[in-house]
Each structure stands twice: as structure tokens, then as C-alpha cells.
């Protein structure tokens, strides 16, 4: 009985602190704003209004994830260059998303670390070979707005994977930011 209470207390502390194996809940007002942001982004993409759609994406946050471990060492010009490159790469992908994505069905929203994660089911056009996929969309709050910053597939961040698999090896061996950007472009062209 005492052991059971100890485990219950540990579990409650983990939930309260938002650490450990459980994710912390998100306030209902924030959940409403997050769903509004994601719904408007999805609508803008489907309507082909890509200029509006990119307002719901945190390109600086994306660039920081891709360049993790090197961001603080980069000059302002290099940072601006990668942010602009990320924006252009994502904008180029919107027409492909428009053709293949029928709908995003949003689910539970939880807080994990410095991001909020929204579970979603990406319902794809079944005339392609793609199958529906469960994903998580990571968001940051910038000022008063929530913005998408990362997509997790099987709990692995796409941009964090780019950093680990492509960017970090290039920069570790003494390569340039330009080489890292080119590697990122190649990955986006593959997708």
C-alpha cells in the first residue's frame, strides 16, 4: 500500500512539473488558439494562399532546430540567410502539400519541453501511394501567436533529424553554412 502511494506521488509530481514520461496539459484557451492557428494554416494551404499560410510558420524556430549547436556561432547575415532559405523551401512545398493532403484531423494537445505538440492524422489523397500518417505538429508561442515549428513522425522531429543527419556532419568536418544549406535543399527536393 505504501509503495503504491509513493508511485502515485511520483506520477503526480511528474505531471505537475511537466517532466518525465508524461506530457503536461495545455490551458483550454491556448488549445483553442492552437487549433485556430492550425485550421487557418490548413485552409490557407488548401486555397493556394501560400503568403497567408507562411504567417503560421515560425521560420526562425525552424532554422534554430536545423542549425542546433551552431546557431549561436552564426552571424546575423547567416541566420537571415537560413531563415529566408527555410521560408523559400517550405513555400515551394505548399503546392505538393495541396495536391496530396486532403485533411489534417487534429487530436490531443500537450506541452512537452519548450514546445506544444498537437497530434494529427494527415489524411492523404489515396490516388497516390501515400498512406494516412499519424504526426505531431510542434508549435511555439511567438508574442501572442502560436506558430508551427516542427513535424514529428514516429516521435522523431524532421528538422532535428536534418540537423543530426546532414547539417552537423558537414559543419563538424569544417564545411560551410552554404554547404549545409545545399544539403537541406537536396533533402527537400527528395520529398
Q: What label would you give each PLM region?
A:
Residues 18-25:
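Sec/Tat signal peptide C-region and signal peptidase I cleavage site
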Residues 47, 73-80, 112, 130, ...:
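Surface-exposed, polar/charged faces of alpha-helical domains
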Residues 9-18:
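Bacterial N-terminal signal peptides
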Residues 25-98:
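Early exported N-terminus immediately downstream of N-terminal targeting peptides
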Residues 24, 84-134, 181-191:
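Surface-exposed, charged secondary-structure patches
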Residues 1-8:
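Bacterial N-terminal signal peptides that target proteins for export
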Residues 132-163:
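Short beta-strand edge/turn micro-motifs at domain boundaries
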Residues 151-191:
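Low-complexity, intrinsically disordered terminal/linker segments enriched in charged
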Amino acid at each position: 500500500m505504501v509503495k503504491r502511494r509513493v508511485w502515485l506521488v511520483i506520477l503526480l509530481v511528474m505531471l505537475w512539473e511537466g517532466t518525465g514520461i508524461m506530457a503536461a496539459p495545455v490551458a483550454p484557451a491556448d488549445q483553442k488558439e492552437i487549433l485556430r492557428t492550425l485550421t487557418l494554416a490548413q485552409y490557407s494551404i488548401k486555397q493556394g494562399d501560400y503568403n497567408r499560410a507562411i504567417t503560421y510558420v515560425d521560420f526562425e524556430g525552424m532554422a534554430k532546430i536545423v542549425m542546433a549547436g551552431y546557431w549561436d556561432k552564426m552571424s546575423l547575415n547567416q541566420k537571415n540567410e537560413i531563415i529566408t532559405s527555410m521560408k523559400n523551401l517550405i513555400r515551394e512545398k505548399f503546392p505538393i502539400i495541396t495536391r496530396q493532403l486532403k485533411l489534417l484531423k487534429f487530436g490531443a494537445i500537450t506541452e512537452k519541453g519548450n514546445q506544444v505538440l498537437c497530434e494529427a492524422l494527415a489524411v492523404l489523397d489515396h490516388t497516390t501511394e501515400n498512406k494516412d500518417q499519424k504526426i505531431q505538429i510542434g508549435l511555439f508561442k511567438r508574442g501572442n501567436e502560436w506558430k508551427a515549428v516542427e513535424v514529428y513522425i514516429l516521435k522523431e522531429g524532421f528538422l532535428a533529424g536534418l540537423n543530426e543527419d546532414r547539417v552537423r556532419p558537414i559543419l563538424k568536418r569544417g564545411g560551410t553554412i552554404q554547404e549545409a544549406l545545399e544539403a537541406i535543399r537536396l533533402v527537400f527536393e527528395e520529398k
